[in-house]
Amino acid sequence: MEKYNFKQIEEKWQNEWKSKKLFKVKPKKNKKKYYVLEMFPYPSGKLHMGHVRNYTLGDVIARFKYSNGFNVLHPMGWDSFGLPAENAARENNVHPKEWILKNIDTMKAQLKKMGFSYDWNRELSTSDKNYYHHEQKIFLEFYKKGLVYKKSTHVNWDPVEECVLANEQVIDGKGWRSGASVEKKLMPQWFLKITKYAQDLEQSLKDLKFWPEQVKTMQKNWIGKSKGLRINFSLDNKEKNIEVFTTRPDTLFGASFIALASEHPISKEYTKKNKEVENFVKKCQENLNLQEEEFEKLEKIGIKLPFNVIHPVTKEKIPVYIANFIIMEYGSGAVFGCPAHDQRDFDFAKKYSLNIKQVIKPYENIKLEKAYTGDGKLINSDFLNGLNVKEAKEKISKFLIKKKQAKTKIIYRLKDWSISRQRYWGCPIPIMYLKDGTAVPATDKDLPVTLPDDIDFSKSQNPLKDHPKWKYTKYSKTGEDALRETETFDTFFESSWYFARFCSPNSKDIIEKKEAKYWLPVDQYIGGIEHAILHLLYSRFFTRALHDCGLLNIKEPFDNLLTQGMVCHKTFKDEKGDWVSPVDFDEKKNKEKFLIGKSEKMSKSKKNVVDPDLILNKFGADTARLFMLSDSPPEKNLEWTDTGIKGAYKYLNRLWDLVTKNLNILSKEKKCSSKCTVKKASFI
């Protein structure tokens, strides 16, 4: 009996698929399409087991759909711009392009060895000018639509990467990649108006029937819809008024002060009139450089302005402060303080001996030693007395709106997307500056704006800024001298539309409409839940923006979303406390010399990774794929064990033996071997 020779078998069938061009696909009117896509990888050098699991899940779905008569699109490409390539260039004295291309060759060979059903004719790389040429066109389309603008703002600055981060790239006050504590810095930045789509992005989440609830909840919370009122408080002895935003109009009768942001127009007005106010405002604006967590921990302080406002119902006079805990970006930059029912207001009122008036009584008799923020019955609130919080909100809102003292208002936590990055290895922003400083978009004749190859990383973190020639150009419309924008796109720009480019990767158009109409949306998308807010939200925004530019006929990019679990492995430390690779651990021989830690996500830093090449060479691709599919549900973490992979290998051997022993029963033809041929290659 012939033994299970996985190398011979896998090589045979992979060559068969290649020669028959089995996975090459094009639109077919008489066949129903199915588009399977796994999040494409950054070409870091080698595949890891997380990749293997992700791509195995996608591959089995693709093959299943093909076997059920679908016309299956299953592409692969490379998210190849980004900081790691630039850092590698600095450390190893190699050009980022060279480093990336070498890594792509290595990883592509690994993927082919795994036997995945990719249509390699559609392969794309985001650092290829044929890709980012069209990306620059997209930027200019967005520019025409008014979705692009530039302004100076306090941005998230990663001191390690020396680069700006979007709000979504700051996790618990630290850079998502470097882990460094992020600082705030005032800088001019290019932005995309994702906030224009905030309402649609939030409301449409309910239509994503086949997305994990956890992902939808994360996006909903990040978009952060708040429904409230804008209430007018008139200034005493003046015709002006202060517009205050609140989500708690039920507490209006407990208002004892108004707090303004340091950037509020009235704050700026009094800065010019009073030196003490000017100094306080400067101090407040320094605090804007802090991360959100640090900002919240600040002592709540303020400075009183020389006027009051009139309460819209009771007509009582209420003092006005500039306060360090109010920001202009939220609401109207002004709030009314109700100390009894907001802890921040409570702390402020205590400090400045302001009135603390309770207007909500808890259902249970409890002693209030701090602000009460729960439900209850309204007290000390005139015509609201006896109502619960919800009823009180509705009644006071109707009252104020009828009196034309308030308007309903919906605001969102979501901020516009900062896309400027102070790095070389990214897509150049197609903007140039004329002598008078005017920013003008590049014309079609100017595209693509390509990166220079002759760069010097020794001078600064951004070689484009210091390049002796590259930044100097001509504005093609007038022929006058101009300077190129020396910043590049956030790399999430590239990954926000690649799924659409896969439909026609070689087209001269940004997106070939006929192909896109046939293939999109993606029927099954697969990737980690860590991308819930970043990539997945940006892709939803891009799809809407591309739709509004007339480039797509869909608004949602992905019908079904599978967020696969991580591949985990036990961790090991030696007697010194240093991480040790599982390869160096032998439980029978030297268990006493090692500390066995908990199972964690595979990572190079903890040395608990398993090299896919070792598994492929020892057990074969089918064994690796079988283990990835059989040991844990796709959404759950998969525990990597030697016994598990060996068990999958033994199972395939038994399956091979079962079939080869009974070939005379299964087929009338003579005994088949791994060297036999078939009349037609099969997708599965």
Which sequence ranges carry the predicted segments?
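Residue patterns forming the tRNA-binding/recognition surfaces of aminoacyl-tRNA synthetases
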Residues: 3, 12, 16-20, 91-242, ...
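Conserved oxyanion/phosphate-binding beta-strand-loop segments in alpha/beta enzyme cores
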Residues: 1-37, 66-75, 98-108, 210, ...
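Amphipathic alpha-helical
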Residues: 14, 194-226, 261-303, 444-475
